[in-house]
Swiss-Prot record:
Keyword Cytoplasm: yes
Pathway per the UniProt entry: Protein degradation; proteasomal Pup-dependent pathway
Designated name of the protein: Proteasome subunit alpha
Family that this chain belongs to: Belongs to the peptidase T1A family.
Coarse class of the protein's main subcellular location: cytoplasm
UniProt cross-references to Pfam families, sorted A to Z: Proteasome
Any one cellular-component term (Gene Ontology): proteasome core complex, alpha-subunit complex
Organism: Thermobifida fusca (strain YX)
């Protein structure tokens, strides 16, 4: 009688984690960052209908990378959960932290109990009355939750994008400057700079000053105009940097 093949729990969890990370890395990146007027979401996404960025509730939004059918199921579950909670209690009781905890429990259970983990990484963000009260939570494939500040990148080559963001990000930027920094980060995803057009970007924001529902998409002519302004500001900054370098020499 042959003995059953033994695999340690540690090895099983490691294999699951490696599998999920590889699946997430195959997708394109997304960026979330705070700016003066709220929270900006920018995703490298050529589809006009399969969204990576969506509204969850009045002040709360969702961004995701990885396998679309899996994070779309999470999004729909989050919307239903938020609607039910807001209807049963009060709309102000629906918070980003509450939704992040619910997602963490779901992903943690799938990772532990299922033979195949979900290949997703998500962000739940809630805009506050001031930048200090904004909340940004990253939830990974195993249910881990990280409270983020300022900016984050996920999916694709997230480390490269994060490094590019760190070079340019400053607190309390304008919306145009925040978009410029986000596009700069995504443009360096593969280690080489590439030009990103409005047709290949999905952009949305949680706008602090907007009444009631804070979520708004930026698309069409407005996005093209903002990208052009950001591109001109980027070129001006590079020209100024070259002049400063020449003066130093």
């Amino acid at each position: 009688m042959s003995m059953p093949f033994y695999v340690s729990p540690e090895q099983i969890m490691k294999d699951k984690a490696d599998y999920a990370r590889k699946g997430i890395a195959r997708g394109r990146s997304a960026v979330v960052l705070q700016y003066e007027g709220g929270i900006l979401f920018v995703a490298d996404n050529v589809s006009r209908t399969l969204h990576k960025i969506s509204e969850l509730y009045d002040r709360v939004a969702f961004a995701a990378v990885g396998r679309y059918n899996e994070f779309e199921n999470l999004r729909l579950a989050g919307v239903r959960f938020a609607d039910m909670h807001g209807y049963t209690y009060d709309r102000s009781d629906v918070t980003g932290q509450m939704l992040a905890n619910a997602y963490a429990q779901t992903l943690g259970a799938v990772f532990t109990e299922s033979s195949k983990p979900w290949e997703v990484e998500i962000v739940v963000a809630e805009v506050g009355d001031s930048p200090d009260s904004d909340q940004i939570y990253r939830i990974t494939f195993d249910g881990s939750v990280v409270d983020e500040r300022d900016f984050l990148a996920m999916g694709g080559s997230a480390e490269r994008v994060t490094a590019a963001l760190r070079e340019r990000y400053v607190k309390n930027m304008s919306l145009t400057d925040a978009l410029r920094v986000a596009v700069h980060g995504l443009a360096h995803e593969n280690g080489e700079r590439r030009e990103l057009k409005a047709s290949s970007l999905e952009v949305a924001m949680l706008e602090r000053s907007r009444p009631h529902r804070k979520f708004r998409r930026i698309q069409g002519e407005r996005l093209a105009r903002m990208l052009q302004e950001a591109r001109e500001a980027e070129e001006a900054a590079e020209a100024q940097s070259s002049e400063d370098g020449g003066a130093t020499d």
